[in-house]
């Protein structure tokens, strides 16, 4: 896929000014130049063009907010002064796997005052004597070269993964906020259901009590009727002897 078509695809109906991260890896650049990328991408902070066949960065637009640039596995051999002009706030630059042979090629990077991390893995320049020491002298603003500082301590976030992880963290935070909101809605619905169930239980409990009370009343009435019946029979038995006595007279 051509680079300009890939850019159009990556936009996903967004405007260029809405894009902060753009990954164009493994697409095809015509004549080894950047194409389809304009200065309308004014908010772009991360650009990756790994293995796209670049031989030059001359067509790079003005990207003042760009902090991380991935150019690894291309055929770039020079012309890096363009980076200082077009991406003045660059902090991470990966040129691994390009045709950089000597220190003079990377000397223009001195103008990138904010550059903290530079990667030159698999470039011929890394075979020079005292390569690391000389690069740190040439670019004193650097903190990490090929993932390690001057004291050979590894960078906390290998290469520029830290920046990408930062973007991912932001997305995760948004997802968590959305999840929390959804969870709260579910909890509220569950609370409402529990309240309704509680009310139903109260109502059914009252009905049961009323039924029990009604039944108790029926039992009491039956007992009263039985007692009355016994009394009446007793009175009849008393009257019968009396009646017999009167007959004798």
UniProtKB/Swiss-Prot annotation:
SMART domains: LRRcap. The modification Phosphothreonine is found at residue 15. GO terms for biological process: nucleocytoplasmic transport; regulation of apoptotic process. Residues 123-161 form the LRRCT domain. One of its GO terms (cellular component) is endoplasmic reticulum. Keywords: Cytoplasm, Endoplasmic reticulum, Leucine-rich repeat, Nucleus, Phosphoprotein, Repeat, Repressor, Transcription, Transcription regulation. It is found in: Nucleus; Cytoplasm; Endoplasmic reticulum. The N-terminus is blocked. Residues 165-249 are annotated as: Interaction with E4F1. One of its GO terms (molecular function) is histone binding. Widely distributed in the central nervous system, with an abundant expression in the cerebellum. Coiled coil: none annotated. LRR repeats lie at residues 18-38, 43-64, 65-87, 89-110. Residues 150-174 are annotated as: Necessary for tumor-suppressive function. The keyword Secreted does not apply. Residues 147-156 have a biased composition (Basic and acidic residues). The keyword Repeat applies. Residues 157-230 have a biased composition (Acidic residues). The modification Phosphoserine is found at residues 17, 158, 204. It comes from the Eukaryota. Residues 147-249 are annotated as: Disordered. Pfam families: LRR_9. Component of the SET complex, composed of at least ANP32A, APEX1, HMGB2, NME1, SET and TREX1. Directly interacts with SET. Interacts with ATXN1/SCA1. Interacts with MAP1B. Interacts with ELAVL1. Part of the INHAT (inhibitor of histone acetyltransferases) complex. Interacts with E4F1. Belongs to the ANP32 family. This is Acidic leucine-rich nuclear phosphoprotein 32 family member A. It comes from Bos taurus (Bovine). The gene is ANP32A.
């Amino acid at each position: 896929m051509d680079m300009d078509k890939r850019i159009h695809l990556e936009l996903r109906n967004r405007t260029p000014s809405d894009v902060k991260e753009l990954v164009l890896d493994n697409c095809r650049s015509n004549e080894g130049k950047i194409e389809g990328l304009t200065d309308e991408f004014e908010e772009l902070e991360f650009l990756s063009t790994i293995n796209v066949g670049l031989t030059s960065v001359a067509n790079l637009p003005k990207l003042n907010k760009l902090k991380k640039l991935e150019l690894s596995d291309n055929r770039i051999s020079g012309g890096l002064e363009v980076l200082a002009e077009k991406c003045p706030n660059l902090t991470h630059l990966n040129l691994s796997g390009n045709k950089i042979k000597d220190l003079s090629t990377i000397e223009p990077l001195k103008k990138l005052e904010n550059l903290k991390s530079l990667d030159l893995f698999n470039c011929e320049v890394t075979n020079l004597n005292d390569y690391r020491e000389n690069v740190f002298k040439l670019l004193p603003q650097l903190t990490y070269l090929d993932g390690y500082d001057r004291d050979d301590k590894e960078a906390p976030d290998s290469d520029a993964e830290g920046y990408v992880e930062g973007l991912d963290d932001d997305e995760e935070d948004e997802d968590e906020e959305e999840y929390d909101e959804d969870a709260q809605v579910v909890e509220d619905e569950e609370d409402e259901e529990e309240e309704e169930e509680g009310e139903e239980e109260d109502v059914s409990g009252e009905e049961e009590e009323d039924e029990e009370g009604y039944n108790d009343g029926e039992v009491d009435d039956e007992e009263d009727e039985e007692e009355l019946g016994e009394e009446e029979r007793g009175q009849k038995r008393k009257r019968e002897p009396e009646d017999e006595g009167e007959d004798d007279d």
